[in-house]
């Protein structure tokens, strides 16, 4: 039984991020617990039936995905050329996804870089760290980040560093030297979005950099496609400007007094509460002195190596606070970091298993689904989405693990399995969570937040339009963003209408029906945007609603989704009983 409890702890929310721990505030704790049904339903006959169905259906889903993508399928010759030699039981591996292939092929190199970076940091910390977890004023952590980051950028992007520097320079000038608050905000956003289009149109241009070319040509670094990772750089650029503009507006002419507070805080004398013991939410708007918004911290933040390639996203205020003022207690708990590393390793091995036994990415690239049943096509799409989830989760967790070892605690990006979602709103809170928090802080709240009625829809439309453009300047992704907003409308409307009936016995079952509709709509939106494209989606919809076998599958799968939704509801009820409410 002890082994089961340890296993449960390993896969709990709390292991991922201390931000997900039960609240310590007794009033909030009781209010969260009161939301839950005090009696667990796991031992009831209803849920025993649900769990039995789950045990039967999940293996059938795996079997269908394997049959539609393995060498026994008649379409195998059409995608065989995309497979590579694997290392599990002599099987081929589907390494055809460009993004994950880059990560997978360079994984040993990344591990070596992590070892070098963390070792250097520990050696330097031996000389500069103060026992109470704060830092020496003579040599701040950000100095090391600045030096290492510049070296890393040159090694990664070579001569293309000049192109990145151009955007950094323009953005810095906008933030620091446009003194009108609204104009600075507008210029920051306009240039930020323009830079995405600029890179799309002119990213491969030399811009006169040929003067640096030697006989062997450009040195473009280990990662020549600098523009692929620029999107994350842009988020940090915007964060610096918007944090600075907001802070400058609040401070007015009182920066001199705050500089004095900063000095007192570092030296430990009469520590002011403004810069001590801030939690993760308070760090987002940490009352930093204006002189912390300098070019050195700007470049150090932009080029912070553990999070540079793909995040998770951490705001400028949070980064500087953790770097130069107070280290997060999470980064000093090595047992927790070890458990996080074990969980990362588990996810990595699951990904390797799926890539060796389900070639769904190769199938989707070649559209090799002729003759497949609606069940098989839907499983191709579903496991494709699972692989997309894993290909994002694994790098994010590796980079977050790297940051934790380095003493910085960024938010966890993925706190739910992709299949453990029934709400479109909650899905976006759990998927790419740090980006979601960034969007809420810098776009959603400034635009008016949730509000009511049409304004909530308009804000959501603006948010998902930016999200789509930020991912890639491609029409199908913009359509995906608008589809998501359209699919949000029924959920928002139903929540407003039926939430007052939440004490009725039938409310849970009504929510289950709504969850089934939500899951279908989310799958359609994401399959169009990221997996099957419009061709594959239209074929699936045609087979579902214009063939007998498809109609039968639609009914059975909807029943299974209802069962899954009820299990998801009870999982969240179990969390509420432990005073955990992550709202997703």
Curated annotation (Swiss-Prot):
Protein name: Membrane-bound O-acyltransferase GUP1
Superkingdom classification of source: Eukaryota
Knockout-associated phenotype: Changes ergosterol plasma membrane constitution and distribution and presents an increased resistance to azoles. Impairs the development of hyphae, adhesion, to invasion, and formation of biofilms, all of which are significant virulence factors.
UniProt keyword list: Acyltransferase, Cell membrane, Endoplasmic reticulum, Membrane, Mitochondrion, Transferase, Transmembrane, Transmembrane helix
Principal place of residence: membrane
Residue ranges crossing the lipid bilayer per the database entry: 42-62, 110-130, 146-166, 183-203, 296-316, 344-364, 374-394, 457-477, 478-498, 510-530, 551-571
Gene name of the encoded protein: GUP1
A Pfam family that the UniProt record links to this protein: MBOAT
Family: Belongs to the membrane-bound acyltransferase family.
GO MF assignments: O-acyltransferase activity
């Amino acid at each position: 039984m002890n082994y089961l409890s340890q296993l449960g702890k390993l896969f709990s929310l709390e292991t991922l991020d201390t931000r997900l721990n039960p609240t310590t505030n007794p009033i909030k704790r009781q209010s969260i617990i009161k939301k839950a049904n005090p009696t667990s339903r796991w031992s009831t006959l209803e849920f025993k039936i649900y769990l039995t169905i789950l045990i039967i259906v999940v293996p059938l889903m795996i079997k269908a995905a394997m049959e539609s993508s393995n060498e026994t399928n008649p379409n195998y010759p059409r995608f065989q050329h995309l497979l590579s030699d694997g290392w599990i039981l002599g099987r081929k591996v589907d390494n055809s996804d460009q993004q994950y292939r880059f990560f997978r092929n360079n994984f040993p190199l990344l591990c070596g870089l992590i070892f070098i970076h963390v070792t250097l940091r520990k050696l330097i910390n031996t000389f500069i760290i103060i026992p109470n977890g704060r830092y020496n004023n003579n040599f701040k952590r950000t100095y090391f980040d600045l030096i290492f980051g510049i070296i890393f950028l040159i090694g990664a992007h070579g001569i293309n560093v000049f192109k990145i520097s151009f955007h950094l320079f323009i953005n810095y000038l906008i933030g620091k030297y446009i003194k009108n608050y609204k104009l600075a905000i507008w210029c920051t956003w306009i240039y930020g979005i323009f830079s995405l289009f600029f890179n799309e149109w002119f990213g491969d241009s030399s811009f006169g950099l040929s003067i640096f070319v030697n006989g062997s040509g450009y040195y473009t670094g280990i990662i020549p496609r600098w523009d692929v990772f620029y999107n994350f750089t842009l988020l940090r650029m915007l964060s610096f400007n918007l944090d600075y503009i907001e802070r400058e507006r609040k401070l007015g002419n009182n920066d001199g007094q705050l500089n004095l507070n900063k000095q007192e805080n570092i030296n430990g004398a009469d520590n002011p509460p403004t810069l001590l013991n801030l939690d993760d939410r308070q760090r987002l708007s940490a009352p930093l002195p204006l002189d912390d918004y300098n070019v050195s911290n700007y470049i150090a933040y932009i080029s912070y190596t553990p999070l540079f390639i793909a995040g998770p996203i951490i705001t400028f205020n949070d980064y500087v606070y953790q770097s130069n003022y107070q280290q997060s207690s999470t980064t000093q708990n090595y047992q927790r970091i070890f458990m996080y590393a074990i969980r990362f390793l588990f996810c990595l091995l699951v990904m390797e298993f799926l890539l060796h036994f389900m070639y769904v990415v190769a199938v989707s690239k070649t559209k090799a689904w002729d003759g497949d049943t609606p069940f098989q096509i839907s499983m191709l799409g579903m496991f494709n989405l699972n692989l997309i989830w894993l290909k994002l989760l694994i790098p994010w967790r590796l980079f977050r693990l790297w940051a934790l070892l380095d003493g910085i605690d960024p938010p966890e990006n993925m706190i739910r399995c992709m299949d453990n979602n029934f709400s479109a709103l909650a899905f976006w809170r759990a998927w790419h969570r740090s980006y979601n928090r960034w969007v809420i802080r810098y776009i959603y709240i400034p635009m008016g937040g949730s509000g009511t009625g049409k304004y909530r829809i308009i804000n959501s439309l603006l948010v998902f339009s930016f999200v789509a453009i930020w991912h890639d300047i491609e029409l199908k992704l913009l359509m995906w963003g608008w589809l998501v907003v359209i699919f949000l409308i029924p959920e928002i409307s139903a929540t407003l209408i039926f939430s007052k009936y939440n004490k009725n016995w039938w409310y849970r079952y009504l929510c289950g029906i709504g969850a089934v509709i939500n899951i279908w709509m989310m799958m359609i939106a994401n399959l169009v945007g990221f997996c099957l494209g419009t061709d594959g989606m239209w074929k699936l919809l045609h087979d579902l609603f214009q063939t007998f076998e498809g109609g039968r599958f639609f009914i059975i799968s909807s029943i299974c989704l209802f069962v899954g939704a009820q299990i998801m509801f009870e999982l969240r009820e179990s969390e509420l009983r432990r005073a955990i409410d992550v709202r997703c």
